[in-house]
Amino acid sequence: MRADAPATDGLDEAARARILAKAALFAPPSNELADGRRDLVGLSREELAAAMAEIGEQPFRAKQLWHWIYHQGVTDFAAMANIAKPLRAKLAERFAIGRPEVAADHLSADETRKMLFRFRDHEAVETVYIPDVTEDRGAVCLSSQVGCTLSCRFCHTGTQRLTRNLSAAEIVGQFMAMRDAYGEWPSPKGETPRLLSTIVLMGMGEPLYNYENVAKAMKIVMDGEGIGLSRRRITLSTSGVVPMMDRAGAELGVNLAVSLHAVTDDVRDVIVPLNRKYNIAELIAACRRYPGASNARRITFEYVMLKGINDSEADARRLVELIDGIPAKVNLIPFNPWPGSTYETSSGNAIRRFANIVMDAGYAAPVRTPRGQDILAACGQLKSKVAGAA
C-alpha cells in the first residue's frame, strides 16, 4: 500500500473488508440471556423499534424505552412510570436491561478507580475512571476487546491473547455501569457539569479491529436524547489500523489519538509490531487525511517514553519533522512498569529535553502524570487475566 494512497483506493477497501471479516471470527455472543430474554442495551434506535414491533407495540414505545434506558439509566421496567403496568410486565417477560457484573473494584490513592467487568460468558475487561484533580469531571477509559492482538512490547494488555471482541452493549455498558457507581443519572443536560465527562477508547484492545461494535456503541453514547455525550468529548485511540482510520473519521468524527511511540520503522517494528503492516509513512498519511482535524480539534500523538529506546533529542527532532503541518499535540507518557515488563522509564531530564524540542516547534507536549499506578490502572497496565487463571 502506498503512503499516499487515497481513502477511496481499492486497496483500502479490500483491506477494510479483510479487517471486518477477521473481526467476525472474534464476534461477541448474542444479546440473548440464558432464560431466553433479550438485552435491550446496545440496540440501535431502529433495532429497538423492530423489537417493539415483534411484540405488537408501536414505534413510539422505542422512543420511551430509549429515554428510560439511556437518559434515566433504569435497569427495571417497573420504574418506567409513563408505561402502563401490563406493558411493563410484558416487557419484563421478553427483555432485560443489562449491566456487566462488577467482579472487582479498586480505588487508587489518587482517586483513580478501576473496575473489572465480567460478562455473561465469564469473559472480563478492565475499565478505568480518571477524575480531574482540579474540577468535578473526569474521563472513563473503555475497553473494546478481551485481550489484544497487537502485542505492543511495552503494554501489559498485549501479553493477554485476544479472546473476542466486545459487543456494543458491553462497550456502552462499561460507561453505564460507571455512571451507576457515581450516581450520575439521569443524564446531565447541556453544559451541566458531569463527573463522567469524557470517554477515551484507550483500554484493552484495538478499537479499529472491532470497528462495527465500537461505532455502534459510540453512536448510542452520542445520541442527544440519551447519554448525550458530544463527539468532541470522545477520543478513539488506535495503534495505526490505517484502512479503518478514514472510515472512523467520516462516520464518527470523534477525536483521534494515535499510539505512535517511535519515529523510525526499525524501532516501531519492534515495540508496535502492527508497524510491519502499516508503517510510519502510511500512518502519518492517514493522519493528514483524517476528517475534521484542525487547530480546534487536534490529533493527539501518544508517545511512551522508554529509556534508551525512543527518548533521544534526535528522536524528538524527527518527531517534529514527521508531524509537520498536522494540527496536533503530543502526549508524552512516562512508561508505567508492570509485572514482567523489561523496559525502564526515561529519566525526568530526558523527558523534559524531549518535550522542550517539541514545544519549541510549536506543538503542545504535556507530560502525562501517571494515575492509578498503585492499582495497575495507569496507561499500558490493564489486563483482565493473570497467569494461571482459568
UniProtKB/Swiss-Prot annotation:
Entry keywords, A to Z:
4Fe-4S, Cytoplasm, Disulfide bond, Iron, Iron-sulfur, Metal-binding, Methyltransferase, rRNA processing, S-adenosyl-L-methionine, Transferase, tRNA processing
Q: Which cofactor(s) does the record list? A: [4Fe-4S] cluster
Q: Where in the cell is it found?
A: Cytoplasm
Q: Mention one GO biological process in which this protein takes part, according to its record.
A: rRNA base methylation
Q: Spell out the molecular function terms from Gene Ontology.
A: 4 iron, 4 sulfur cluster binding; metal ion binding; rRNA (adenine(2503)-C2-)-methyltransferase activity; rRNA binding; tRNA (adenine(37)-C2)-methyltransferase activity; tRNA binding
Binding-site residues, S-adenosyl-L-methionine: 205-206, 237, 259-261, 336
Matching entries from PANTHER family are given as: 23S RRNA METHYLTRANSFERASE, RADICAL SAM CORE DOMAIN-CONTAINING PROTEIN
Alphabetical list of NCBIfam families matching this protein? rRNA_mod_RlmN (TIGR00048)
What is the designated name of this protein? Answer: Dual-specificity RNA methyltransferase RlmN
**Species for this entry:** Acidiphilium cryptum (strain JF-5)
